[in-house]
Amino acid sequence: TTTNSLTRDLARDAVNFSSKDNLAPTSITLNPAEQYQTMDGFGAAITGATCFNLLQMKPADRHAFLTETFSDNSGFGFSYIRISIGCSDFSLSEYTCCDTKGIENFALQSEEKNYILPVLKEILSINPSIKIMAAPWTCPLWMKVKSLTDLTPLTSWTNGQLNPAYYQDYATYFVKWVQAFKAEGIDIYAVTPQNEPLNRGNSASLYMSWEEQRDFVKTALGPQFAAAGLSTKIYAYDHNYDYSNIESEKNYPGKMYEDGEASQYLAGAAYHNYGGDREELLNIHKAYPDKELLFTETSIGTWNSGRDLSKRLLEDMKEVALGTINNWCKGVIVWNLMLDNDRAPNREGGCQTCYGAVDISNSYYKTIIRNSHYYIIAHLSSV
């Protein structure tokens, strides 16, 4: 139990069940014939910024926090993690795993070796059953063009589109990345082809219409995953309920499902809540009931009183947690697990007003303040 005044702070209460027939004024009726989705888990993003902050902590303090967060025996049992393939807007620098032209130059980079992998390995030592999903914020710059009608190379981390001539190389990039993490003892449960494919303006971004994503999945990514024997799931879309109000992009994953060659490789679709209404989840489920749904990103920050539990706790439980589960999502993942008290590290052009699920003081990297997103995921994971 958690109250917004923190008079009760993730308090555990024993429940005494009664055999009495009269449960008035409350009764619960179960209908075994009506079944809903099974749950894959609940969690947060382990970004470069999160890992940086965690690794500033004393090892004993860090391990205690990670145990409290991820242990399904002595902690809250967070069970789903989202990471970036290459950089995100909360990385320590802009990079991909193949910045030198030629897919033969693929290699994990220093941020992954020095920050991401050590933290993931520590988490997995605490809870080996954690599911990890991943998404790129951008392809390598040598694969980018200004647009599909102007194939001029674009050497910018922001905006641009994937040159179709590099579909196969980019699919190989995904395969090599999944295999590289596997070689480090880390299984990747799922990927999306692109984080926020309709967002041209992030510090690292790549525009990818539904037609582009369909063609990339059916001609390159799906076949290459199959040929490599990868069991990693592929989820479409990974962006907002409102499709950025672009008429031609509405029903983005549904249009991909209508293509049988692409659909065979797609487990489902992933959504964020920075625009539109969660009713779109129900619309997609009703139209494509055999496809899965995930909720993969939401943020708190200065714009929505993100550190004020009296304003955020119940609202986030209603809209983010229960609102997505009640609309068929199998997983719920919030954004940065940990930022510091200055909302850092962050990237210019990315979100510099976001809070973490927890914030840690950057004076001594010891004092941690839990925000609403930590509480809602902790409550869901503990059930």
Language-model segments: what does each one mean?
Residues 1-9, 13-26, 30, 121, ...:
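Substrate-binding and catalytic surfaces of secreted/luminal carbohydrate-active proteins
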Residues 8-188, 209, 219:
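N-terminal catalytic cores of secreted or lumenal carbohydrate-active enzymes
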